[in-house]
């Protein structure tokens, strides 16, 4: 196991106990987190994501990753986050994981949960933690995932990993949007029923090209996902009831975010989209402490910002991250003024405390 705190994106650090953010240093010589898209497919059909619509069927080769690994080790990568889509659909997924383990790099898998039962033994063998999508209680989750028995397959998968016996941290992540904002408390109960270790909530990104949305969404697609002005008071009521009824879950951090953060990052976000508020200021050092490598080799500073280059076309990842253009872009980046950053739903505020990396 690595010293990286399990799934740093979900670890809460209260303001009174915060250490400073990891510094925004240029050139980048230490990169604790690397987010990797192993392939371009998904086994769900969610309304808030278009990855499943891809017909490219691309995937990163194990030989390519093995060639890049020595440099990633030199950059101090502590954790690789295997994202998607559904990373478990990669044709040689476990060879990828074997390479990361051999390099001493911890593994986080972001999964729909559909294939977890099939792969339970190897998930327990290779992975430090698993983050599963949970969109609500059974009926809501199945409707949003738009495939038969999605919730049931998720439940079977979590149970199968638990049954292996090795302790693996399993988190849930819920994207709050029009189809589920009324059932946040029920989502917490569902997370308990599934024996998840924690549940996190975030708003839906409707503004960028991320998640296979070249050119972005038109107004009709945005309206399917983003809350309307008339729905905002109902969201406020649900968050208030959640704070009132889930006090213990907030206190012991079963719910990853504090009540105040949920109001800032979800309610205020949708208020801002409707012109009722400003977007909440964010604290983020993602472009300095992490990077995203997509299936076709595209390298981004985070999920949402434009590409910095392509790893297949460059001599190294460092050459991309530390090019004159990339350094100039980071030095000019003001996360509270940049249009993409202001609307970000998934910022990263990475700190180091007690020898571990934590988010918060």
Locations of the language-model features?
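Radical SAM enzyme [4Fe-4S]-AdoMet core and its adjacent flexible, acidic
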Residues: 1-4, 8-10, 103, 126-129, ...
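Flexible mid-to-C-terminal extensions adjoining Fe-S/redox cofactors in radical SAM and related proteins
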Residues: 1-30, 52, 276-287, 292-360
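Conserved alpha-helical substructure of the radical SAM core
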Residues: 2-129, 223-235
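Amphipathic alpha-helical recognition patches that constitute DNA-binding helices
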Residues: 33, 37, 171, 205, ...
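Conserved residues at the C-terminal ends of beta-strands
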Residues: 52, 83, 133, 202, ...
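Short clusters of small/polar residues that mark proteolytic maturation junctions
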Residues: 53, 92, 203, 303-304
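Flexible, active-site-proximal loop/turn residues at the rims of small-molecule/cofactor binding pockets
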Residues: 55, 86, 136, 205, ...
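Short glycine-/acidic-enriched loop or helix-start segments at secondary-structure transitions
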Residues: 92-93, 119-120, 141-142, 211, ...
